[in-house]
């Protein structure tokens, strides 16, 4: 049987065995609802709050209650964008984002437009960079939120979040960042980034699918999107997924403990992969290869070929890659990220994403 090689870690990483072990007691032996007052419920509450405190400390949060557990990156992005905009609608109805955001942010922004908000999508340059001056020019007196990703999920290009946040805060506008791809890969601490809200997801770092969190700085108003009980301090109704919270905290601890060594290893593998491909296939280009980017991500443009055909051929040969966000991979639309970078249509259509992870080896890259 042909060996299969997984090169789509930006879409999702396998559950780490150590994380599974941390979740096992909760899955099999802890029946309590964290909102119940009996002994089982109190025990569940202790475990939930320990996970919250641990994750908050890893993020550099001032208080553990700034961490809201959710079902993943999409819910975190929706809660941040819609929650802040609607909570601050009495102060204005203008939101700023970028043209290269994850579909979760773009869809939430589109929903705001239907509700009467104005949304400005900032442009990026040909390498995927965002100039803070663009943000400065876009801010208006009625701007109530800036939502800009930390690292692009397709190209890996990193935005200069501290500089962008400083521009927004000078105008007293809160900042949300989608750090789903960057958390655990590069340094991500809210005091250093200067953001007020931050989204992260467990299944990108070896945690369970369906786990995630939204950091919300104390004092930031947030209109809940799920209504019902008073869980998560009335910011997200519904019985907390204790196993997911425990797994997310465990995955985050492992990812941060191993981050520096793993980033150096993956960066070397990525550079080797790009060099080998360009040696073997003339004309292959790296999209967004100039600016600082995530160590595990490579977006490659192949001349004279359609990405869909290439992905099928690679899959048949045993290589799992993608054309972009897994949320959109079933669609045949060209990448909105590469189009926003102003790349020629034929280059956009011939581009694929290769993303490495904890189990990727030098042997696999050489294959």
Model-derived features: positions:
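Pyridoxal 5′-phosphate
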Residues: 1-367
């Amino acid at each position: 049987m042909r060996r299969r090689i997984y090169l789509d870690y930006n879409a999702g990483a396998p559950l780490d065995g150590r994380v599974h072990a941390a979740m096992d007691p909760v899955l099999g032996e802890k029946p309590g609802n964290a909102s119940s007052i009996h002994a089982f419920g109190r025990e569940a509450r202790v475990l939930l709050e320990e996970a919250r405190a641990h994750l908050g400390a890893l993020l550099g949060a001032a208080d553990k209650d700034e961490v809201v557990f959710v079902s993943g990156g999409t819910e975190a992005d929706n809660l941040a964008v819609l929650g802040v905009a609607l909570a601050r609608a009495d102060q204005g109805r203008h939101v700023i984002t970028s043209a290269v955001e994850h579909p979760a942010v773009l869809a939430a922004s589109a929903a705001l437009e239907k509700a009467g908000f104005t949304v400005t999508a900032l442009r990026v340059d040909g390498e995927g960079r965002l100039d803070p001056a663009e943000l400065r020019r876009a801010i208006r007196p009625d701007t109530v939120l800036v939502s800009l990703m930390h690292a692009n999920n397709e190209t890996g290009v990193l935005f200069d979040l501290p500089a962008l946040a400083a521009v927004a805060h000078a105008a007293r506008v809160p900042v949300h960042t989608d750090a789903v791809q960057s958390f655990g890969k590069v340094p991500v601490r809210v005091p250093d980034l200067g953001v007020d809200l931050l989204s992260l997801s467990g299944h990108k770092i070896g945690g369970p699918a369906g786990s995630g969190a939204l950091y919300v700085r104390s004092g930031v108003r947030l209109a809940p999107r799920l209504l019902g009980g008073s869980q998560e301090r009335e910011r997200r109704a519904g019985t907390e997924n204790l196993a997911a919270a425990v797994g997310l905290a465990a995955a985050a601890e492992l990812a941060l403990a191993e981050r520096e060594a793993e980033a150096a290893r993956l960066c070397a593998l990525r550079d080797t992969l790009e060099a080998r491909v360009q040696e073997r296939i003339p004309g292959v280009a790296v999209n967004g290869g100039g600016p600082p980017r995530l160590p595990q991500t490579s977006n490659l443009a192949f001349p004279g070929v359609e990405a869909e055909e290439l992905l099928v051929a690679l899959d048949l040969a045993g290589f799992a890659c993608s054309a972009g966000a897994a949320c959109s991979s079933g669609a045949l639309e060209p990448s909105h990220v590469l189009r926003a970078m102003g790349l020629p249509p034929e280059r956009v259509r011939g581009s694929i994403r290769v993303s490495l992870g904890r189990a990727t080896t030098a042997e696999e890259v050489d294959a």
